[in-house]
Structure formats: C-alpha cells, structure tokens
Amino acid sequence: MKNVSEIINQGNKNAELPAWLNMRHAWSASDAKRDEGLIYPNNVIQIKNLDYKKEPDHQKWCEAVELLASQRTMGEKTSEKYSRIFYYNEPDDASNLDSERYASNSLFDIYYPAEPDAQTSYPVIVSVHGGGWFYGDKELYSYYCCHLASKGFAVVNFNYRLAPQNKYPAAIEDVAYLIRYIHENAGVLHLDMEKFYMLGD
C-alpha cells in the first residue's frame, strides 16, 4: 500500500498547475499502474455513458440491449476486452483530467450479466468511486464493476461533480440524483430496487 506522498512523488509535476491538479495527475498515474494487465470477464455486457440528469431515450436503450444480447458490437473499441460494449453517448473530453467536463459531467455505465433476460430484474449495486471528492471517474472502477456483474448483479458505475470546481455538497447531490434516476427508471433498466446495495471507497 502506497502512502499519499509516494503517489504524489511518482506523478509528473507541472509548476504551472495548481497543487490539487498535480495530485489528480499523480493519482491517475498510480491507478494506471494498478490496472495494468487486467483481463475483463467475458460474461458481462456494458452500456456506457448514459446521463442521469437527462430524460432517458427508451427506444435507444432497447436497441442497445438487443444489440448486445445478439453479441454484435458497436463503437470503436472492439478488442476482446470491450467485445460486449455499447456507447450510449460519446464522452467528449470527459476523460481529460485538465478539462472542465472531467470535473462536471453526469455520465454513468450499467453492467449486466452477459445473457440479459427481458423478464428479469436484477439486484443492483451502485458503485461510488473513490478520490476524496476531487479526483477519479467511473473508468477507474470498470474492471471491479464488471467482476461484480459477472456474479449476477446489475452494477451502476457513475461520475459525480468534483471539487474544487464544484463546491460541496455537489458530489453528494449527484449521488442522490443518480439514485433517483435509477429508481424512476428501474423498470426500463431491469433493476430490482428491493435488492439495492451501495459500495465505495
């Protein structure tokens, strides 16, 4: 287990950037090393980059599920790691640590067991990514969430607004927005909200 100073020291410091942004880059470098060589389970389908602050497009959602159930692929990533993935929306520059969108987007992913059943509602796990409310995004936990989904759960993995661009309690509010969204759309998303779990670090 590395301590914070070790992680910061291994990052590429830029004197022109504020300390908190350098820390974001340092944590990102550490997490990238952690995830090297991971092999994703092949019995999971992923629907990525929905937006929990926008009304859902039910037709597009049904098309995504049908596409994945037929084991076809859509999107640019077609390696075995991403063979059952559907990009509901493109993320723009949401993965750029220096961008405003990285700190202020409301995208989320859902992971399902590989053989979705239109008549089944799955027990649901919501994953709140770590990072002290100022760093991190859903991609950091994609492998972990896929592993949970491979055990028979629907797993929701999401972004929330980060500090310091967004003042407290913005991140907490986004957790509430996400939960309300999946509750209101549980039927379409095949989620059993009577079997609802949350986790995070």
Question: What spans do the regions from the language model cover?
Answer:
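Short N-terminal helix/helix-N-cap motif within the alpha/beta-hydrolase-1
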Residues: 135-139, 165-166
